[in-house]
Design a protein with these regions (language model features):
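Amphipathic protein-protein interaction modules
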Residues: 65-123
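Aromatic-anchored, charged helix-turn/loop surface patch used as a conserved interaction hotspot
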Residues: 33-90
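Acidic, proline/glycine-rich low-complexity IDRs
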Residues: 114-140
């Protein structure tokens, strides 16, 4: 089976300010699909915090999803497409507030579509590299 990069790209969205100590998504190489951590915990009869330890003892069929730091990506985008004043303003905010303000600014500036295309492109690159690193057949 071959995974379509566009089908998995959005699973890599990661917000470090939520401070989770576990992966939200896992890829089942056999079924060629993403599975959320809660379902994985049920499958392996463990809590989500123990998944890495439990799965590391398996046959390598499950792979933790890639992560793209979305607030960092938003700042990268802001430095390229927003005014210097807006980017400087965002940079001074705590990450959670910055994310909210970034969304407000791109909506106000009518840049939402451009942002989502930019984000998808970066997520797709990360997904493709993750597939290569984990020997997962893919198509773009």
């Amino acid at each position: 089976m071959v995974v379509n990069i566009k089908d998995i790209a959005h699973y890599g969205r990661w917000f470090p300010f939520y401070k989770r100590d576990y992966d939200l998504w896992w890829f089942d190489k056999e079924k060629c699909q993403m599975i959320d951590a809660e379902k994985m915990g049920i499958t392996f009869d463990c809590d989500v915090h123990s998944l890495h330890n439990v799965i590391s003892q398996c046959d390598g069929n499950y792979v933790a999803c890639f992560r793209v730091d979305i607030p960092a990506l938003e700042m990268e985008y802001a430095r390229i497409y927003l005014s210097k004043e807006e980017a400087d303003y965002l940079f001074k905010l705590p990450p959670k507030d910055m994310d909210r303000e970034f969304q407000r600014i791109i909506e106000q500036e009518a840049l939402v579509g451009r942002w989502y295309r930019y984000e998808l492109a970066r997520l797709s690159v990360a997904a493709e590299q993750w597939c290569k690193d984990n020997h997962i057949p893919y198509k773009v």
